């Protein structure tokens, strides 16, 4: 049985001059560029209400794009009874607080045991929504808030809201190093040229913007609040590593333990045992896809980050006289 795909969005001004298939692949990252090219050639794409069958057609920015296509369902994912921490639910959306060690969508190395499998068990009708209603993702070991659409119209509207940057996502993190001020990282991100599971800053990458401000200083670590303007894969992790302040625990992007001089064995042990990136999606704000009402949710940092921060705070108090930046 074929699955119908209906998508609408507006081309960003930042995509001026891109090929149509390239622009659409950026706008709808859950679909490959080759699939999108096929849809264009098969006249399944409207640009400003007009059929367009030329993948090489250049976009100007601001065009209204609509896709109405079908995908042959090659895989039926299994519903699995995996607990979900549901923060909010109505007829159109779910907001969940994702724990660590939980992948969002099945893929290589993770064929099941994901948020998607849990959603299929919790709300079986969501099987009729592409990707079981998943609108955006969090990395396996990133915790926090995610919105899920329960209907196709809700998903279409939420995806469009993401493209228009109408959804606000804020994170808490702990970075390595003493940071003196907040700021913005505006650096494009693409897949790493040799490590295909990694991302990296690259001049030919997709635009990526991360804003950050300082919440608390420790001896050689900094607690941050960050806001995404875009949503590239591993964006916060890559951007913080790029400015030489990788996240604590992020072994992919350089966040290996770096205890301060004279740290207690207990604190060193706490640092070494923290085996994930210290990153939590703490706030989500959006306009409801049906009512249009602005809604906002908050999720406190999980216990492992609480313990990490408490240990850093205690270390700071024990060595306050040795800190040279006070």
Swiss-Prot record:
Which source organism does the UniProt entry give? Salmonella typhimurium (strain LT2 / SGSC1412 / ATCC 700720)
Please state which protein family the record places this protein in.
Belongs to the pseudouridine synthase RluA family.
Q: What is this protein called?
A: Ribosomal large subunit pseudouridine synthase D
Q: What class of enzyme is it?
A: isomerase
Annotated spans, Disordered: 183-203
Q: What is its main location?
A: cytoplasm
Q: What does this protein do?
A: Responsible for synthesis of pseudouridine from uracil at positions 1911, 1915 and 1917 in 23S ribosomal RNA.
Q: Could you give the subunit structure recorded for this chain?
A: Binds ObgE/YhbZ (AC Q8ZLS5).
């Amino acid at each position: 049985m074929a699955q119908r795909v209906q998508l609408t969005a507006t081309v960003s001004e930042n995509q001026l001059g891109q090929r149509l298939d390239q622009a659409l692949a950026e706008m709808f990252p859950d679909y490959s560029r080759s699939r999108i090219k096929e849809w264009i050639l098969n006249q399944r794409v409207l640009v400003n209400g007009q059929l367009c069958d030329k993948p090489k057609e250049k976009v100007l920015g601001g065009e209204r794009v609509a896709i109405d296509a079908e995908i042959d369902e090659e895989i039926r994912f299994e519903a699995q009874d995996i607990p979900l921490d549901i923060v909010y639910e109505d007829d159109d959306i779910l907001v969940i607080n994702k724990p660590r060690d939980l992948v969002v969508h099945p893929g290589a190395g993770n064929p099941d045991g994901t948020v998607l499998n849990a959603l299929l068990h919790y709300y079986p009708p969501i099987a009729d929504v592409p990707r079981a209603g998943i609108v955006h993702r969090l990395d396996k070991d990133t915790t926090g808030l995610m919105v899920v659409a329960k209907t196709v119209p809700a998903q279409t509207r939420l995806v469009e809201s993401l493209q228009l940057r109408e959804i606000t996502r804020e994170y808490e993190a702990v970075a390595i190093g003493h940071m003196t001020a907040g700021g913005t990282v505006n650096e494009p991100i693409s897949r790493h040229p040799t490590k295909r599971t990694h991302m990296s800053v690259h001049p030919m990458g997709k635009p990526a913007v991360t804003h950050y401000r300082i919440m608390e200083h420790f001896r050689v670590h900094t607690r941050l609040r960050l806001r995404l303007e875009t949503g590239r894969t591993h964006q916060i992790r890559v951007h913080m590593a790029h400015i030489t302040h990788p996240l604590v625990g992020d072994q992919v992007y350089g966040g290996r333990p770096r205890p301060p001089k004279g740290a207690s064995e207990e604190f060193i042990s706490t640092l070494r045992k923290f085996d994930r990136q210290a990153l939590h999606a703490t706030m989500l704000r959006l306009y409801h896809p049906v009512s249009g009402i602005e809604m906002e949710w908050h999720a406190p940092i999980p216990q492992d980050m609480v313990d990490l921060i408490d240990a850093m705070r205690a270390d700071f108090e024990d060595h306050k006289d040795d800190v040279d930046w006070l």
